[in-house]
Amino acid sequence: MDCSAMSSDQEPDYVGLAPYLYYSDATAALAWLTRVFGFTEEVRFEDGSGEVFQATLRAGDARLQLAGVGPEYWEAKGVEGPVGQLNVVYVTDVDAQHERVSAALGEDAAPEPPQDQPYGARIFTVADPGGNSWTFWQQVTDQVELPSGWREVRPEDQEAEETGEVPG
């Protein structure tokens, strides 16, 4: 693709975004993500011993990738290992998803129940065996009730502030 033909003010034509997660045991991670969250396996690539070294999963219309890497991968990058990340999964019924995850994990590992947030979402978070956090998010209202001193700022509001215009 010749990027020189794109102007600097042209919007990129994105077709998607997928997290790429690293696990020390990708085979176990793949099994856990499909069993606990109900993600659908799209494809996996196994090495000669049958261990997963890369896989693609689906969560609704979204995709995520995972890979198995050992300590030598992190040593070559000059870091001690993965630090995990937070992944947000948008759902239509967060309470039903919480029930599913809780049932799959059992009583000893069940996540905290969903909580309403001041920005109109109802969420719960659970960590996977690789140290990644997964927040399941249902937008329940457009009403935002921020704590005192907080404010919601959108790009158009920032532009108006910079030019002295009153947003309307």
Describe each PLM feature range.
Residues 2-20, 30-31, 37-90, 98-127, ...:
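Vicinal oxygen chelate
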